[in-house]
From Swiss-Prot:
It holds the Pfam family Prenyltrans. The gene is pggt1b. Belongs to the protein prenyltransferase subunit beta family. This is Geranylgeranyl transferase type-1 subunit beta. Its cofactor is Zn(2+); Mg(2+). CDD domains: GGTase-I. Keywords: Magnesium, Metal-binding, Prenyltransferase, Repeat, Transferase, Zinc. Binds 1 zinc ion per subunit.
């Protein structure tokens, strides 16, 4: 089966988005690395990375400029604040060709890394063929070590910030897998936290006692997959499967009694892929729904038909289509959200 989207138009949409974004994206600049990841990985899935050949080294340099390192004079200073930030903020010197070392006085107050930005930075570098020689792996792992809460195993997104939830636990697991160092995470405590987020619907909320939602459910299952502990799902796997399959209307929705949204082709689709139940859904309907949400003139995919497209929905829709084994789209490793081509044999074999 072929895709219902115009792949050439989508590739041009990603290419334009790399160079300029409309004003509404301004509020997303704290997560700028995720926007670049959507574009770069989207072109990778479409087999169009040749488009990036001229800009490739500039993108790699830009990603490294987002890295926050320990003090150059004393590597033990500021270990809790290392990783990748999304973008430059007030008071931080703009520098587009080298990573930033913090001063002896510590980091600027609002210049913080986050686990999602670090995860996206590492994936961008992998897709573009970087060898990670500029990544301070020790500093990232040492910083990550300070993020896990002892009381329940939850992990925060940034140093001294109280947003503990499954998004950041997943990002931490992905970072640990990518850097091949799990020493920062108490695995059993992390698994206990995942279990605590299970709702009465037998899917997962973002934090304990929250409504089951497609995004956190993906984060929970992907974390367990990276941890090698999908067996945790066995006692309620059939109920979880039922909840996931029932999210399909034409496309998937993310919560019970909500309208379909193209991004859940990834969140729900990848969850079903990881538990080996994707054969239970109607892929032709998913394909058609995504095709109907592609903007004829702009080329990107919106959250639903008739809306304006954006890079997130365009990318996650494309990943959702990859689960249908469409020949023109690269296959994706669901638990990493990365093409098998970019992952390479070394990462892929560790996940089998």
């Amino acid at each position: 089966m072929g895709s219902c989207i115009n792949e050439e138009k989508l590739a041009k949409f990603f290419q334009r988005s790399l160079n300029a974004l409309p004003a509404p994206y301004t509020s997303g600049l704290p997560n700028h690395l995720s926007l670049i990841f959507f574009v770069v990985s989207g072109l990778d899935l479409l087999n169009k990375t040749d488009i990036l050949e001229k800009e490739k080294q500039d993108i790699i340099n830009w990603v490294y400029s987002r890295q926050i390192l320990p003090s150059k004079d004393n590597p033990e200073i500021n270990l809790e604040n290392c990783g990748f930030r999304g973008y430059n903020f007030l008071g931080q010197e703009f520098c587009c060709d080298k990573s930033v070392h913090t001063s002896e006085n510590g980091p600027l107050e609002y210049d913080l890394p986050s686990t999602p930005n670090t995860y996206c930075a590492l994936l961008i570098l992998r897709i573009l063929g970087d060898d990670f020689s500029g990544v301070n792996k020790k500093a990232i792992i040492d910083s990550l070590r300070k993020r896990q809460r002892e009381s329940d195993g939850a992990i925060s997104g940034s140093p001294n910030v109280g947003d503990y939830d499954l998004r950041h636990l997943f990002s931490a697991c992905a970072i640990s897998f990518i850097l091949d160092d799990w020493s920062a995470i108490n695995k059993e405590s992390a698994i206990d936290y995942i279990k605590s987020c299970l709702s009465y619907e037998f899917a997962f909320g973002q934090t304990p006692q929250q409504e089951a939602h497609g995004g956190p459910t993906y984060c929970a299952i992907a974390s367990l997959s990276l941890l090698g502990r999908l067996d945790v799902l066995e006692p309620f796997k059939e109920q979880l499967t039922f909840w996931l399959v029932k999210k399909q209307i034409t496309g998937f929705c993310g919560r019970t009694n909500k309208d379909p949204d193209t991004c859940y082709a990834f969140w729900i689709g990848a969850s079903l892929m990881m538990i080996d139940r994707y054969d239970l859904i109607d892929f032709a309907s998913i394909n058609a729904f995504i095709g109907s949400a592609q903007h004829e003139a702009i080329g990107g995919v919106a959250k639903e038909p008739g809306q304006l497209p954006d890079v997130m929905h365009s990318y996650l829709s494309l990943v959702g289509l990859s689960f249908g084994n469409i020949p023109s789209i690269q296959q994706v490793i669901p638990c990493l959200n990365l093409s098998k081509r970019a992952a390479g044999k070394d990462w892929f074999e560790k996940l089998i």
